[in-house]
Amino acid sequence: MRVKDTLNLGRTKFPMRGKLPVTEAQREQLWEENKVYELRQKLNEGKPTFVLHDGPPYANGNIHIGHAMNKISKDFIVRYKSMSGYRAPYVPGWDTHGLPIEHQLTKSGYDRKKMSLTEFRDLCREYALKQVDKQRTDFKRLGVSGEWDHPYLTLDKEFEAAQIRVFGEFAKKGLLYQAKKPVYWSWSSESALAEAEVEYHDVVAKTAFFVEQIKDGKGRLDNDTYLVVWTTTPWTVPASEAVAVNPKFDYSVVNPANDDRKFVVATDLLEKLAEKLGWEDYEVVDHLMGQELEGMTTQHPYLDRDLLVGLADYVTADAGTGLVHTAPGYGDDDYNFGKKYDLPIFAPINDQGVLTKENGEGFEGVFYQDADDVSLQKLEENNALLLQEPLQHSYPFDWRTKQPIIFRATDQWFVSIEKMRQNILDALEDVKYHPEWGKVRLRNMIKDRGDWVISRQRVWGVPLPIFYAEDGTPIMEEETINHVAELFAKYGSNVWFEREAKDLLPEGYTNEHSPNGKFTKETDIMDVWFDSGSSHQGVLAERDYLTYPADLYLEGSDQYRGWFNSSLITSVVCSGHAPYKEIVSQGFTLDKRGNKMSKSQGNVIDPNKVVQQMGAEIIRLWVMSADTSADVRVSMGTFQQISEAYRKLRNTFRFLLANTSDFNPEENTVSYEKLQSVDKYMLVKLNHFLKTMREDFDNYDFLDAYKVLINFVNNDLSAFYMNIAKDVLYIEAENSEVRRSMQTVFYDILLTLVKLLTPILPHTTEEVWSYMNEPEDFVQLTEIPDPRTFAGEEELLSKWDDFMEVRSHVLKSLEEARNAKLIGKSLEAQVDLYLTDDQKQLLDSLNENIQLLLGVSALHVHPADEAPADADQYNDGVAVKVTTANGETCARCRMVKEDVGSDPAYPELCARCAAIVRENFPETAEDGLEE
């Protein structure tokens, strides 16, 4: 018999390399065939419900790494709750209406103007469903578990019907109105936009300082006086109706040398302006307060129109002249100013951003950006332009087309936020936020939010269920809206475009505003944020196994102005409360330099490629390791690093499996009271680790959980317990108490880790589970254990923590001895340890083989005051001296012992190994051992 055959070398077929790209897909197929998600739901019937409601991604294009981070984070929570005593169904959703899908069809050569609306809408639907199928495959391949065969889509008939009923609640409460107001207008999309559909970029604008001659100075200013007006949008000057001044500003009347005109500017800006305009020598001839200018009129610089001077607090002295050109059809402030002074709301520009003939000669047919130059030229021709200069400032863009937008007054439908603002703010108080600053952010957004423009001039979406009577009166009655909802539930929203208005109204419907029984219908559709914002009614309130409000919404931080926001508004209107009990927000995924990922930059990471090259588990572990509450930088190098951490976890599982392969939990388990002290210590540590991990999971703090996990695996297991375990597990007799004691804890660690990590690494833990003799077919169908406490554990931990401090000194001295070439491996060392009486008592109280715990061949303990001068001294009074151990190396345990060969039958073994072999392999006493 060989020496090797007398050892209990761990054995397992669990592979060191996971071959994840191949094995994960096979395992996912197995889950699907065995309906593991459905089995888990069945197991949890009757338990408390936890619902994470999925914010629907847009059904267009491939998933990106941000999608992966979001969906995997949700999967962590749903899987964890499912294994922790909750019924946690997960219904994935998709946002399937909207402009990008229309654009995709246009790019593919379809012209919506050359086909019927229903034909075009059918093509949109077909495209959206294909995108859903594609994204669903990708999400499933990330290991995300859920109702993939029964998701929610905003184009579903039932969802559209629910959305119409939500609209009905707004109508019933008088929160809808139609008005001609300036809205964000996207000429590239030919539609109004909501705030959530706008992003800001820095642009360089052409600004103009120009003059308007006083026409009626109210006896205070003469006709040879000119107001110096400033604008950042010269193309809007043809629509100018007024000049706004601040009532509290002091204004100077200035007469520059070599100019017979007098100019009015804000006194605080005079010095800066004089420098810009080259007024080296000027005289201030008068002062007046802004409020004195109110009611004066000026002459438009190049059109035959009188302009009013009015008061506005929004005029600042940060830039310009303190006098602002005002066009009520082109901005919120201008609009409110216009309403205050009863000015025309005038926006002479078409849907494509092209100016119309109402702007005057030279402007008709000119694109608004080109019209800047036309306007500047006209100002110059009329001797009204004092200065033109560039200005860099933040400007709104269409978030989908990436083109700049304009403010334009058009007839739109609005939701009055003002009427219910306080109710919405009150509802926020009942919500818990992660991170906590989310509350302030959402609160401020609601506080500052203007009325919500919900109409869109597009075709692929849910129609506004509004009818018009013969005299133009809008009809939004409960009866008509409910009837439309019923039609949508039966036929889908296409019915709106297929039928005449009279065929969409309830049978026999009459209205006093239509004496002839004639009606028309609205042609605009709803903002897609109204679609997804209605999901609490279309999904949570519709499916009886879900709950409303949901327990949790988890999305990117941009959703404070998007889905969190629109869902909150609609929910408060429908039910008087928020649709969620908790919100978790995440940052964006950026490249390694902190730049936004974009195809044009070539810095996009495709999660599908990472899956194909490394496996979904690597992405999942990365998500756990990332601080997702802020923006996350990621590169392929990040995944390489995570692969190393994964390899460490995998090898930990392999070591635990190998060294429990001959352990039967039912027969070999040692009770806590009978465990060796070091094993008790590790069992207590394991349960403290489990408690912390569960707390982190409960708080959705997966980053901290990752740190706790890596610390436990690297320090408690790899660097200590698994390191010292080899001597016990390999060397001691197979059935010895000390070995079974350690295996008991090993198995507990294995069982805890495999269950605890299933929400994070389900492919790997299911693979590990297949090598364990547990009754359940899938680890996903088990429960994560609750942490246990043990009698006297605090005292035990205190002792062992003190010992670990002593051990750290010994390890440091051993490292120095290795560096000095005094020893090679630690097993070549003898350690002389010099301790105080308290420290010696500590070691004795552990009742352990301290030499084994230190990993050396010989240990001698002495009083602290006997420490020689060349010993390593440590602050707590410990001294350590490392020398080369005397004796020969035992062929079995590899320790250097003076008693090697003391048993003549085993000349190559130390006394300890000889006794173990003689007792367990008696035949070798005569035959001897081979190397």
From Swiss-Prot:
Residue ranges annotated as motif 'KMSKS' region: 596-600
GO cellular component, as recorded: cytosol
Top EC class of this enzyme: ligase
Binding site for L-isoleucyl-5'-AMP: 555
CDD domains registered for this protein in UniProt: Anticodon_Ia_Ile_BEm, IleRS_core
Record EC number: 6.1.1.5
GO molecular function: aminoacyl-tRNA deacylase activity; ATP binding; isoleucine-tRNA ligase activity; tRNA binding; zinc ion binding
Residues that coordinate or bind ATP: 599
Swiss-Prot/TrEMBL keywords: Aminoacyl-tRNA synthetase, ATP-binding, Cytoplasm, Ligase, Metal-binding, Nucleotide-binding, Protein biosynthesis, Zinc
UniProt cross-references to Pfam families, sorted A to Z: Anticodon_1 (PF08264), tRNA-synt_1 (PF00133), zf-FPG_IleRS (PF06827)
Keyword Metal-binding belongs to the record: yes
Top-level lineage group: Bacteria
PROSITE patterns referenced in this protein's UniProt entry, alphabetically: AA_TRNA_LIGASE_I
Binding site for Zn(2+): 890, 893, 910, 913
Note on cofactor: Binds 1 zinc ion per subunit.
'HIGH' region, short sequence motif: residues: 57-67
Protein family per UniProt: Belongs to the class-I aminoacyl-tRNA synthetase family. IleS type 1 subfamily.
Domain notes from UniProt: IleRS has two distinct active sites: one for aminoacylation and one for editing. The misactivated valine is translocated from the active site to the editing site, which sterically excludes the correctly activated isoleucine. The single editing site contains two valyl binding pockets, one specific for each substrate (Val-AMP or Val-tRNA(Ile)).
Self-association state and partner proteins as the record states: Monomer.
UniProt name for this protein: Isoleucine--tRNA ligase
Gene: ileS
